């Protein structure tokens, strides 16, 4: 990697690895640093003698001569969501026992993922190297596999801290986790491996988002994509197009955005093909790849513009490339997947596009640029045309596209836009299995009136009213009617302001969706 502005280089770090083991043992017999018990409010019910009615809590409490009941009462632990207490009590094989509140019940992937994050939190706080997790209430047989996957994912992601740009960083101490009461055997082990593969894909996505724009230029993003392909060269090929090659493909919309930057654009195309068997379905995942967005001549100014966070404007590409990494590990059969990113910067210079310019996309449609800060859709336009030309059956694009979607849905969920009910059902089901939140928004065709231009086929933004919808309608102009297509506006959930970190949102849903379209 060449020297960057400020001479900044990230510390080379590998993701922290954890050994997961599924066990069916008596919790009293477990030996290690911290035993974590997930507890609902109902589990804490006591009989007339102030003894726990729950079998697991009763057994542990009896082994501790009533200390667990006594201390949990003194700590005012009621099992409410997010509540936790860590106790150091003599008499168990574990050095500590932690009670984690689950509320009324725990059943959804989101709830189990949150429990996993809580396990990570108490393990870090106690500097434990080994942990076990068990629920006071048993898990239903039909939900054990999905639950164990979400739990493991929560632990891996909960332990993640990005210390690459700190002069001193500390790695988590947790190395081994035993998961008790969720079953054992090949199916459980497969689910645990799947959870790890997806989680490390999410972490890769987070690291891409967190990388500052003076480090993660379009060229470096392309390098990172090429590394994924070379790591899994048995199933991946990479084609990185330079500016001249993009000109030959008439990508005028994409290149107009890139024109102002000293860092040239790089168009990324990875292709996954299964190692064995025939291909039944061809998919494309298209991610917005603005490694920095100044807004161009419509520069981002004023309170709330968050220009300092515009390194995350490549969050869509982070989701796509994180999914590529996970799919390289999982190797789903029967499905071919194209990963496409039009990477560039939106900067200001004498060579940049101006408000009022008319540009031409690779499908021949002309666009009047009435706002240079509505640039993501211009890059996606040519990326979507390119994706359709690969002969794919379905396309999902992801982008931090509009503030309007954040106003509508907040920061916990993304909006989805598609004319296909079938595709909507597929992707929403995948998001529910992965624990990510999506909400289907309308594609109101009458709003296209706001996108009409007097001098070109369309303008690139229709104003504030219905802004996320008109943005999706704009993208629709560059997708073949023969291809099922969905747009995901992930501007809200791309960033966790409390943790000051990218989330890797979208990776898990994309992998689940690809899996569902495979023949596995």
From Swiss-Prot:
One of its GO terms (molecular function) is aminopeptidase activity. Keywords: Aminopeptidase, Chaperone, Cytoplasm, Hydrolase, Manganese, Metal-binding, Protease, Stress response. The active site is at 300, 377. Belongs to the peptidase M17 family. PANTHER family: LEUCINE AMINOPEPTIDASE 1 (PTHR11963:SF36), LEUCINE AMINOPEPTIDASE-RELATED (PTHR11963). Presumably involved in the processing and regular turnover of intracellular proteins. Catalyzes the removal of unsubstituted N-terminal amino acids from various peptides. Possesses leucine aminopeptidase activity against the model substrate leucine-amido methyl coumarin. Possesses Cys-Gly dipeptidase activity. In addition, can cleave Cys-Leu and Leu-Cys dipeptides. This is Leucine aminopeptidase 1. The gene is LAP1.
């Amino acid at each position: 990697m060449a020297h960057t502005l400020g001479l900044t280089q990230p510390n080379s770090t590998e993701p922290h690895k954890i050994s997961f083991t599924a066990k069916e043992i008596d919790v009293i017999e477990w030996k290690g640093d911290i035993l974590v018990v997930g507890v609902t409010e109902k589990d804490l019910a006591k009989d007339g003698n102030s003894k726990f009615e729950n079998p697991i809590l009763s057994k542990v409490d009896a082994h501790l001569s009533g200390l667990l009941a006594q201390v949990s009462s003194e700590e005012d632990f009621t099992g409410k969501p997010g509540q936790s207490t860590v106790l150091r009590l003599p008499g168990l094989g574990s050095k500590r026992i932690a009670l984690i509140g689950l509320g009324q019940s725990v059943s959804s992937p989101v709830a189990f993922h949150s429990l996993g994050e809580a396990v990570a939190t108490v393990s870090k706080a106690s500097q434990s190297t080994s942990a076990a997790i068990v629920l006071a209430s048993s898990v239903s047989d039909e939900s054990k596999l999905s639950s164990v996957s979400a739990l493991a994912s929560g632990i891996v992601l909960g332990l993640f801290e990005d210390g690459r740009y700190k002069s001193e960083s500390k790695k988590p101490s947790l190395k081994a986790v035993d998961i008790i009461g969720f079953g054992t055997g090949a199916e459980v082990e497969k689910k645990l491996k799947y959870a790890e593969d997806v989680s490390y894909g999410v972490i890769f996505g987070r690291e891409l988002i967190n990388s500052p724009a003076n480090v993660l230029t379009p060229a470096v993003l392309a390098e990172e994509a090429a590394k994924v392909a070379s790591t899994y060269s048995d199933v991946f090929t990479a084609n990185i197009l330079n500016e001249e090659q993009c000109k030959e493909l008439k990508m005028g919309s994409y290149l107009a955005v890139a024109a102002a930057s000293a860092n040239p654009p790089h168009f990324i195309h990875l292709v996954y093909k299964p190692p064995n068997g025939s291909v039944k379905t061809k998919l494309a995942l298209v991610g917005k790849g603005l490694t920095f967005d100044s807004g161009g001549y419509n520069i981002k100014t004023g309170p709330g513009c968050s220009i300092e966070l515009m390194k995350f404007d490549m969050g869509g590409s982070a989701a796509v490339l994180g999914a590529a990494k996970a799919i390289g590990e999982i190797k789903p059969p029967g499905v071919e997947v194209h990963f496409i990113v039009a990477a560039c910067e939106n900067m200001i210079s004498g060579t940049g596009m101006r408000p009022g310019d008319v540009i031409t996309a690779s499908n021949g449609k002309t666009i009047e640029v009435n706002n240079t800060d509505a640039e993501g859709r211009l890059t996606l336009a040519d990326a979507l045309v390119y994706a359709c030309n690969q002969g794919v059956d379905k396309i999902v694009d992801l982008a931090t596209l509009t503030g309007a979607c954040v106003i509508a849905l907040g920061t916990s969920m993304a909006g989805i836009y598609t004319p296909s009910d079938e595709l909507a059902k597929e992707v929403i089901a995948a998001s529910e299995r992965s624990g990510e939140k999506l909400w289907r928004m309308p594609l109101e065709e009458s709003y296209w009136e706001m996108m009409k231009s007097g001098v070109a086929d369309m303008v690139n933004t229709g104003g504030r009213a219905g802004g996320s919808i008109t943005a999706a309608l704009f993208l629709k102009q560059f997708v073949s009617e023969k291809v099922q297509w969905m747009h995901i506006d992930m501007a809200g959930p791309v960033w966790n302001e409390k943790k000051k970190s990218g989330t890797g949102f979208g990776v898990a849903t994309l992998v689940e969706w690809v899996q569902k379209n495979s023949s596995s």
